[in-house]
């Protein structure tokens, strides 16, 4: 995999109650996205919030030569995964 995302998202009453977010393929070891988790817990689970959280998480990322594309790929993948989890949580 070029990048991977592992996530657990809990939503109650229109707010993120739980979030665990791990990223793979963008660092020498799996990366726990603690800043993104902290920002999102308590917020509304919108695509904009997801995007802002992963942008905050990756603001200091320093990709190796030839791997800069992985930062944008990670951003898009995180938002897509969290959107899917949110939509599943809302419909179940």
Go through each PLM region and give its residues.
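C-terminal structural segment of proteins
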Residues: 1-92
